[in-house]
Amino acid sequence: YRVFVDKWATVKPMSAAERRAIETFLDEANNLDQLMKRSAKLLADLTKQVAVITYPITGEGSGSEKMTISGTANLARSGEDLGTSLSPILEALEEQVVLLRLLGDANDTVKVRIGGEQSESNLRQTSLVTVGYGAAESPVGALGILGPTRMDYAGSMAAVSAVARYVGRYI
């Protein structure tokens, strides 16, 4: 999968209709909590994977320890692609510190970790696609998706990138 992902590393653009749908959906958020929850739901729906979003770091340095997750049920739909029991993956998802560590090095470039490239042993049957959001050179938060190693990488990378761009505009 790594060769494929590296070969197709350029993120395919989303259609104008998809971009409008994202913008309209996120425009309906009235506060930060709604924006984060709607963004996670949107990302999970677009990719059919588990979406994780950290809250932005505020001026006081807080926020990055808070996150929202959506689409955990999508793991059950791709159970055969994961090759193992879902229990270790679900355990890792419940550990907020694990997720914060996985998203902690996200920057303004989409990053893909596949299978054994994961630092967390419970997630070695999965792939993680992450990116930071906020100002281009200094992201204030991160978002990503977690799913089986057999996923639509090009589509997932495009969705992660697009949602990050829109969330960054609203922050």
Protein language model regions, located:
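Intrinsically disordered, acidic Ser/Thr/Pro-rich low-complexity regulatory segments
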Residues: 2, 6-171
